[in-house]
Amino acid sequence: MAGLPRRIIKETQRLLAEPVPGIKAEPDESNARYFHVVIAGPQDSPFEGGTFKLELFLPEEYPMAAPKVRFMTKIYHPNVDKLGRICLDILKDKWSPALQIRTVLLSIQALLSAPNPDDPLANDVAEQWKTNEAQAIETARAWTRLYAMNNI
């Protein structure tokens, strides 16, 4: 971790010492700005029982710039596109240096519990979510079984 800003070292140490329930985030052995993240599908959500792999990268400008985060596991969600990019305000225009890696991961976990089809990244999924929520939830469950179980 030599050469890393103290803030990143402190945040990493805290993530490892006090993990967030349902979230595992470990820095890559060769690049401490790159994290391997696993988020458990929240209880009572269509993603329950799934484990979702994400990658999180801290740019040089961090904490002045938001981390780059994307899903590596396929997920049927109105706020995640086919490339795994996430539509979340704090990853874009609502980012503040006061926020931390931990906050970002908790926000992504919350997004799994409460998809927001009114601010979509995947328009087709959002449309399905708005016109036939029961069917969208069933598809999300099916994708969770297909892509997010037994994948770790």
From Swiss-Prot:
The gene is UBE2N. The active site is at residue 87. InterPro entries: UBQ-conjugat_E2_core, UBQ-conjugating_AS, UBQ-conjugating_enzyme/RWD. This is Ubiquitin-conjugating enzyme E2 N. Pfam families: UQ_con. Belongs to the ubiquitin-conjugating enzyme family. Residues 3-149 form the UBC core domain. GO terms for cellular component: cytoplasm; cytosol; extracellular exosome; nucleoplasm; nucleus; protein-containing complex; UBC13-MMS2 complex; ubiquitin conjugating enzyme complex. There is a cross-link at residue 92 (Glycyl lysine isopeptide (Lys-Gly) (interchain with G-Cter in ISG15)).
